[in-house]
């Protein structure tokens, strides 16, 4: 699973989810990609589930690139804890994804296989997404 090797601080503020993505809006590596249409926090487990869904479908052909990284810790209090008593312990790592961000890219496979693999990965993600091609536009 994806987590940072080390961070300067153990706990951080929650990131801002408003606004469009400032970078990472274009396909850089593959031929087809998943682009987010809504803001969301994507956890390291969701990224891993989407990666496994894609790689199992394409089998040995093609290549998958993950262009987001969960670099922010999200904290939670234990269940049944009373209010107060400080900030909770880091529970999981998230990537702050804004609308327009390209999250996964795929290359080296036909359009039909890429489309189905990316559709399976979209089912694992917590927001609305679309599949785009390098030539331009939706598929």
Curated annotation (Swiss-Prot):
The keyword Transmembrane helix does not apply. SUPFAM superfamilies: Ribosomal protein L16p/L10e. Belongs to the universal ribosomal protein uL16 family. Keywords: Ribonucleoprotein, Ribosomal protein, RNA-binding, rRNA-binding, tRNA-binding. Gene3D superfamilies: Ribosomal protein L10e/L16 (3.90.1170.10). One of its GO terms (cellular component) is cytosolic large ribosomal subunit. The gene is rplP. Residues 1-22 are annotated as: Disordered. One of its GO terms (biological process) is translation. This is Large ribosomal subunit protein uL16. Residues 1-16 have a biased composition (Basic residues). InterPro entries: Ribosomal_uL16 (IPR047873), Ribosomal_uL16_bact-type (IPR000114), Ribosomal_uL16_CS (IPR020798), Ribosomal_uL16_dom (IPR016180), Ribosomal_uL16_sf (IPR036920). GO terms for molecular function: rRNA binding; structural constituent of ribosome; tRNA binding. Binds 23S rRNA and is also seen to make contacts with the A and possibly P site tRNAs. HAMAP family: Ribosomal_uL16. It holds the Pfam family Ribosomal_L16. Part of the 50S ribosomal subunit. CDD domains: Ribosomal_L16_L10e (cd01433).
């Amino acid at each position: 699973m994806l987590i940072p090797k080390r961070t300067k601080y153990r706990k951080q503020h929650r990131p801002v989810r408003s606004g469009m993505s400032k970078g990472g809006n274009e396909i850089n590596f593959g031929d087809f990609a998943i682009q987010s249409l809504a803001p969301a926090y994507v956890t390291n487990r969701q990224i891993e589930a989407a990666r496994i869904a894609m790689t199992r479908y394409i089998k040995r052909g093609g290549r998958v690139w993950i262009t987001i990284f969960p670099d922010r810790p999200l904290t939670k209090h234990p269940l049944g804890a009373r209010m107060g008593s400080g900030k909770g312990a880091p529970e999981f790592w998230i990537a702050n994804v804004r609308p327009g961000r390209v999250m996964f890219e795929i290359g080296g496979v036909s359009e039909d296989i890429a489309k189905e693999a990316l559709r399976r990965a979209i089912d694992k993600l917590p927001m609305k997404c679309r599949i785009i091609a390098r030539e331009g536009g939706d598929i």
